[in-house]
Design a protein with these regions (language model features):
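Catalytic Walker B motif of ABC-type/P-loop ATPase nucleotide-binding domains
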Residues: 79-82
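Conserved ABC ATPase "signature" region
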Residues: 31-49
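Conserved catalytic motifs of ABC-family nucleotide-binding domains
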Residues: 75
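ABC ATPase "signature
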Residues: 139-140
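Conserved ABC ATPase signature
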Residues: 54-58, 62
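A short, surface-exposed alpha-helical micro-motif characterized by mixed small hydrophobic
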Residues: 121-123
Length: 183
């Protein structure tokens, strides 16, 4: 399954039909079985009552949960998440993080989460790979990474402004700029 950053719901399909889509496209299940499975998946993400709504009628957090229900529609062994917490309010963010962990445990699946949200990821992850400049910069349990003395890891986890990842884009000195040398 795959949950993209903005959910990628089909705007012309209802919540129900968005979740049913992979079942209809990739299985030979009858409509009654699909109905039951879709309602179970929507119930798992707290949206069974929203089955009849269109994507334009639900919030961004709800849309993300519909996309999550669609991602688990076929009970995949691997679920990939692209920035699942981006743009969510604090309540939706917490709910989504808890749902990812609970569904992962219930389905006995493996999740790959690409994100910059350290706190939420560390709360639900068993093992983390940190990527910097296209390479694995560090790996380990959240606890191990929190104890890391590696400068990149320390800066990223603690949201520090100073470290190997520069905040300022390279430029001439500020003195040169105000001295009239730079435009």
């Amino acid at each position: 399954g795959m949950l993209s950053q903005f959910g990628a719901l089909f705007t012309d399909l209802s919540v129900f039909d968005n979740v049913a889509f992979p079942m209809r496209e990739q299985t030979d299940l009858d409509e009654e079985t699909i109905r039951d499975l879709v309602l179970m998946k929507l119930n798992a993400v707290g949206l069974r009552g929203a089955a009849h709504l269109m994507p334009s009628e639900i919030s961004g957090g709800m849309a993300r949960r519909v996309a999550l229900a669609r991602a688990i529609a076929l009970d995949p062994a691997l679920i990939m998440y692209d920035e699942p917490f981006a743009g969510l309010d604090p309540i939706s963010l917490g709910v989504t993080a808890n749902l990812i962990r609970k569904l992962n445990d219930a389905l006995h699946s493996t999740s790959v989460i690409v994100t910059h949200d350290v706190v939420e990821t560390f709360e639900i992850a068993d093992y983390v790979y940190m990527i910097n400049a296209g390479r694995v910069a560090a790996e380990g349990s959240p606890e191990e990474l929190c104890r890391s003395e590696e400068p990149f890891v320390k800066q990223f986890i603690n949201a520090l402004p100073d470290g190997p990842v520069r905040f300022h884009y390279p430029a001439n000195s500020i003195e040169a700029c105000f001295g009239g040398e730079e435009r």
